[in-house]
Amino acid sequence: MTEMVPAWVEGRLMPVEKLEAHQRGLRHMAISVFVMAGEAVLIQRRAAGKYHTPGLWANTCCTHPRWGEEAADCAVRRLREELGITGLVTVFADRVEYRADVGNGLTEHEVVDIFVAEAPSDLPVNPDPEEVWETRWVDLTDLAREVKEHPERFTPWLRIYLAEHMERIFGKLRVVQ
């Protein structure tokens, strides 16, 4: 199935096939979700079959809205599709932009709406194996330390979020050094 995502081509937002957006390094819309249980965040290891950054740890979920889809609706959809998570209230945290090489000649140049959702630590999670290899809860401070010590284990966008946008995403109470 061809997935059309909102991307800027010559300064105009228009539908572009997702893989083409990455091949051309086009600036495009995305969403990222962080599900939190207190100070712990649910992270996922991307499935081995993903066409970029397979096997790397990422935030709870992320994707690109379909052409015409609202970012908030997309966040809820991907929690359900990737992780089988329903019933959480996602709250818009911020919008950030980044550009990163994700290997195999592909570039993520994303304008990302970031959402945070609070959940119980015993939240039922049922990952789609086509999308997610495994999940785990990790304390945000420990995650920030792991990313600094072993950046090669994590997606470029998670490294960027934690290095450059902690306060904007998690608020002053959750900022770690």
UniProtKB/Swiss-Prot annotation:
Record's GO cellular component terms: cytoplasm
CDD domains: NUDIX_IPP_Isomerase (cd02885)
Domain of life, source organism: Bacteria
Catalytic reaction(s) noted: isopentenyl diphosphate = dimethylallyl diphosphate
Keyword Magnesium: yes
UniProt remark on cofactor binding: Binds 1 Mg(2+) ion per subunit. The magnesium ion binds only when substrate is bound.
Gene Ontology biological process terms, A to Z: chlorophyll biosynthetic process; dimethylallyl diphosphate biosynthetic process; isopentenyl diphosphate biosynthetic process; photosynthesis
Pathway the protein takes part in: Isoprenoid biosynthesis; dimethylallyl diphosphate biosynthesis; dimethylallyl diphosphate from isopentenyl diphosphate: step 1/1; Porphyrin-containing compound metabolism; chlorophyll biosynthesis
Residue numbers binding Mg(2+): 62, 82
PROSITE patterns per UniProt: NUDIX (PS51462)
Keyword Magnesium in annotation: yes
EC number: 5.3.3.2
EC category: isomerase
A GO MF label: isopentenyl-diphosphate delta-isomerase activity
Domain Nudix hydrolase: 26-160
Pfam families xref list: NUDIX
UniProt-annotated catalytic positions: 62, 110
The protein's required cofactors: Mg(2+); Mn(2+)
Binding of Mn(2+), residues: 22, 28, 64, 108, 110
Keyword field: Chlorophyll biosynthesis, Cytoplasm, Isomerase, Isoprene biosynthesis, Magnesium, Manganese, Metal-binding, Photosynthesis
NCBIfam families to which the protein is assigned, alphabetical: IPP_isom_1, PRK03759.1
Family from the record: Belongs to the IPP isomerase type 1 family.
PANTHER family: ISOPENTENYL-DIPHOSPHATE DELTA-ISOMERASE
Function as written in the Swiss-Prot or TrEMBL entry: Catalyzes the 1,3-allylic rearrangement of the homoallylic substrate isopentenyl (IPP) to its highly electrophilic allylic isomer, dimethylallyl diphosphate (DMAPP).
Protein known as: Isopentenyl-diphosphate Delta-isomerase
Source organism of the structure: Cereibacter sphaeroides (strain ATCC 17023 / DSM 158 / JCM 6121 / CCUG 31486 / LMG 2827 / NBRC 12203 / NCIMB 8253 / ATH 2.4.1.) (Rhodobacter sphaeroides)
